[in-house]
Regions:
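Intrinsically disordered, low-complexity regulatory regions enriched in serine/threonine/proline
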Residues: 1-15, 27, 34-168
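Pyridoxal 5′-phosphate
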Residues: 20
Length: 168
């Protein structure tokens, strides 16, 4: 795990996770929290853009946030993680009871394929990248579903305040 990811996880421990705990989300990992009400489960999950950063046009630690519900009447699929006897579904396990959240901040800095972060591409991936870059709007724009985390970390606090407000 990179130092930047560790710093982001520390910041989450000081903002979002305590706020969610106050609302009954008592179990969590670094990027997922669960709330249990009988056999019903609520999920809040954060996903870093990661390896898709170049195509999305933002730094890899920029975040998407999903909320989901896993009601007792959904079939219990095999493969859903269990810890201490409790299901720990991810947002994608909760279909159709999931949604992506949208930020309230204006961040018109997304520029797909404006820089190549990983130069060690296989020839087939390089061709795929070139084809995608011709199809995707490469002008600067905003994305409502992704909190843009600047590489220098200067807007992490602002993003986490907005993210926490939107989640709650």
């Amino acid at each position: 795990m990179s130092d930047d990811a560790k710093a982001l996880n520390r910041a989450l421990r000081g903002t979002l996770w305590p706020a969610l705990k106050a609302h009954g989300f008592t179990f969590r990992t670094d990027r997922v929290a669960w709330r249990y009400a009988g056999d019903d489960i609520d999920v809040v999950e954060l996903q870093a853009v990661g390896q898709h950063a170049e195509a999305v046009g933002c730094p890899p630690l920029s975040l998407s946030v999903y909320v989901a519900a896993y009601p007792r009447f959904l079939p219990r699929e095999p493969g859903i993680p269990v810890r201490d006897g409790r299901l720990r579904p991810h947002y994608w396990d909760c279909d159709p009871f999931r949604r992506s959240l949208h930020k309230t901040l204006s961040q018109p800095w997304f520029r797909p394929f404006s820089e190549q972060r990983d130069r060690r591409l296989l020839p087939s991936l390089r061709l795929h990248r070139e084809a995608l870059s011709k199809l995707i709007d490469r002008t600067a724009h905003d994305r409502p579903d992704i909190w843009y985390m600047r590489d220098d970390g200067s807007n992490v606090d602002e993003n986490l305040r907005d993210l926490t407000t939107v989640v709650l």
